[in-house]
Amino acid sequence: SDRYGFNNPDNEWDKKEINYFLVGDSFIHGNCVNRPHDISSVLRKLSNKSVLNLGLAGNGPLTEYATIREYLDKNVKKVIWVYFERNDLENLQEESGRKILKNYLNDLNFTQNLKLRQNEIDKIEIDLLESEKKKLKYLLLDDLISFIKFYRLRGMILSKFSKSINFQSDFKKILELSKKLTEKNYSKLYFVYLPEYDRYKKGMYNNTNYNL
């Protein structure tokens, strides 16, 4: 990973100009795909331009908006937001119960200054990993699978999940705020919509995840 824990060559952060700034979940993160076959590496090769990949597995729309807020610099030309319809709204429903993330939605001046706190973030992550390693030998296989699927780290304080009846309106607000933020930064926002296979294979057209 790079200096901030994302899947990039570290020197990408030192480029005078960032042509592509990617946010998303596991598709962008590069889960199960090694460099140079992940999306950002392929884009970097085909375009011969600088690409920053800020995707992380498990991220939802609110975390992705918070990522833009925390890491977007003036030298970024294009922000590419990759949305996966299979579970991103479900992730947003969970994220809407996290006070620390809701602050980004309700307070345009809120920041955790994450770029300046990487040493602190690293320590938190190391402590959590060491703590979980001690527990692993006591976990049954099903518990281990659940742990791996649920485990998400980004140095943020997590609160209990609660359902949000307004998560679809939150999604609209997130997109509007993201557009305004990128315009203010003189960057251009591109929203890439990844459809779910089951929507067409199984005819799940009325699933709420597919009807925003």
Where are these regions (language model features)?
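Membrane/wall-proximal cationic-aromatic binding patches
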Residues: 1-46, 154
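N-terminal secretory targeting modules
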Residues: 1-19, 74-75, 88-93, 97-98, ...
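Short, flexible loop segments at the rims of nucleotide/cofactor-binding pockets, characterized by
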Residues: 1-3, 55-59, 167-168
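A structural signal for isolated positions on well-ordered beta-strands in alpha/beta enzyme cores
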Residues: 21, 52, 80, 190-192
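Structural preference for long, well-ordered alpha-helical segments in enzyme cores
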Residues: 23, 67, 175-178
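Conserved SGNH/GDSL esterase-like catalytic core that processes O-acyl groups on lipids
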Residues: 29-107
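Serine-dependent acyl-ester chemistry module
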Residues: 84-212
